[in-house]
Amino acid sequence: MIGVERVQTGIRIEKRLLKVLKGLAELKDLSVGDLLEGVVLHAFEGKTAFSKETLAQIAELKKIYRLTLRAGDSHQLRERP
């Protein structure tokens, strides 16, 4: 184990995306924070964070929560008034 110092943060995130993240975290027995740390650390190194099996689980969660957003949509999202 590597010792780290974590801080509490408040972020705003798209509602359906959060539902998918929470569902995946539960499937993997992780906190959402641990899941996000892993995804970001993999992305920083240009690596995929997920196996084919996990990607299939994500696809199912996206269907369940009607998440249609894709990578190309990032940085273009605007909150509804």
Describe the residue ranges of each PLM region.
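Short interaction-prone segments
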Residues: 49-68
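Generic leucine side-chain signal with a strong bias for well-ordered alpha-helical environments
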Residues: 17-21, 35-36
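Short Lys/Arg-rich basic patches
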Residues: 1-15, 22-25, 63-81
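A generic structural signal for alpha-helix starts
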Residues: 15-16, 30
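Activation segment
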Residues: 21-22, 44
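Low-complexity, intrinsically disordered short peptide segments enriched in small/polar/basic residues
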Residues: 4, 8-10, 29, 36, ...
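Generic low-polarity alpha-helical segments
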Residues: 1-3, 47, 59
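Short, basic amphipathic alpha-helical segments that act as recognition/interaction helices
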Residues: 28-55
